[in-house]
Regions:
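Terminal helix-turn-helix DNA-binding modules in bacterial transcription factors
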Residues: 199, 212, 230-272, 276, ...
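Short hydrophobic/aromatic patch on the recognition helix
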Residues: 97, 225, 229, 274-275, ...
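Residue at a beta-strand N-cap/secondary-structure junction
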Residues: 84, 208, 257-258
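N-terminal low-complexity or simple alpha-helical regulatory segments
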Residues: 1-43
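An amphipathic alpha-helical interaction segment
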Residues: 119-131, 137-206, 212-216, 220-224
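…primarily DNA-binding HTH/wHTH and HhH modules…
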Residues: 1-12, 36-37, 266, 276-296
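N-terminal regulatory/effector-sensing and dimerization cores
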Residues: 1, 43-139
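Short helix-to-turn junction characteristic of helix-turn-helix DNA-binding domains
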Residues: 78, 201-205, 253
């Protein structure tokens, strides 16, 4: 895979499965005609939760997927082996017992890293820019997750959709799949101190925030704040601050005609060049290219 800086707005998605990769898929409808998915059984009830497709993957090298502008939230939970996923401009290692949640309309990529198979379950949503995505501002990007139940739900859904195809059974399986994603994406046990702190930060994204400021709001030490954020969000406090700023920037690029420099200042970047470089690293394209893509 080329370095991120080499990815141009004209680049295309990449799908490399290789001869040893195996997968099973359930899709919401027949609109997706890609070779690897077009023969999969259909469960229309998935669309009630805006789910496009779900599946299990046994990936082996040279397995590699690149999505330049992923059109929906994507959750991956590993149950054996390990692989790499590109999240927020950085490659993150995903091992067994770990999940990753990617928000919509950003660059996403995944690949194998060793000769051993990487086995995971995934759920891919299809969301429009005007709808509220599954991934929220307090959703973790990575974190501990027992994939057993989600894997079983996807296997059950596939078996039912391939066999009896009873609506009542499909309903229960699809509900379980969605609820297991929600359990990871919107944890009810989220630390109240973090919630209050990030609520205040989101209301003042244009100001300069330093780690001591954040720790003071949360009433914890700087080191404890780092540990809390790592545990709850899979990010450092500074990384999550950047995430919130870029989420707001994407919204402003979509709904306003403000100049990029104006938006950069509004979300807390003193330099438009720093804003542009950071935006490209996390989202996969520069702000001006991102805005242009919204018009197509």
């Amino acid at each position: 895979m080329p370095p991120l800086d080499d990815v141009s707005p004209e680049a295309v998605d990449v799908e490399v499965f290789g001869p040893s990769t195996r997968h099973l898929v359930v899709r919401a409808d027949s609109s997706d005609t890609r070779k690897w998915i077009r023969e999969a059984p259909i469960c229309p009830l998935l669309a009630q939760h805006q789910i496009s497709h779900v599946g299990l993957m046994r990936a082996s090298p040279p397995f590699e997927i690149v999505r330049l502008d992923q059109s929906g939230t994507f959750m991956l939970a590993c149950f054996e082996g390990e692989g790499m996923i590109l999240a927020e401009g950085q490659w993150k290692r995903i091992r067994a017992g770990t999940a990753c949640l990617q928000p919509p309309f950003v660059m996403n990529a995944l690949k194998c890293t060793s000769g051993k198979p990487w086995k995971f379950v995934w759920v891919r949503y299809h969301e429009t820019r005007g709808t509220r995505p599954v991934a929220s501002s307090l959703s973790p990007v990575t974190g501990a997750f027992d994939p057993t139940a989600l894997k079983a739900a996807v296997e059950g859904l596939h078996a039912e959709a391939s066999g009896e195809n009873a609506i009542s059974a499909l309903h229960h399986w699809s509900e379980l799949v969605h609820q297991y994603v929600i359990r990871f994406a919107q944890p009810h046990q989220a630390d109240g101190r973090l919630w209050r702190m990030w609520q205040q930060v989101e209301s003042e994204l244009g100001r300069v925030w330093a780690l001591p400021d954040l720790a003071a709001i949360a009433c914890v030490s700087e080191e404890h704040l780092r540990r809390l954020c790592r545990k709850e969000l899979g990010r450092t406090p500074v990384q999550h601050l950047t995430y919130l700023r870029l989420q707001r920037a994407r919204h402003l690029l979509a709904v306003t005609d403000d100049k990029v420099e104006t938006i950069a200042r509004a979300v807390g970047f003193e330099s438009p060049f720093s804003f542009s470089n950071t935006f490209k690293k996390w989202v996969g394209r520069r702000p001006s290219d991102y805005r242009l893509s919204l018009k197509h």
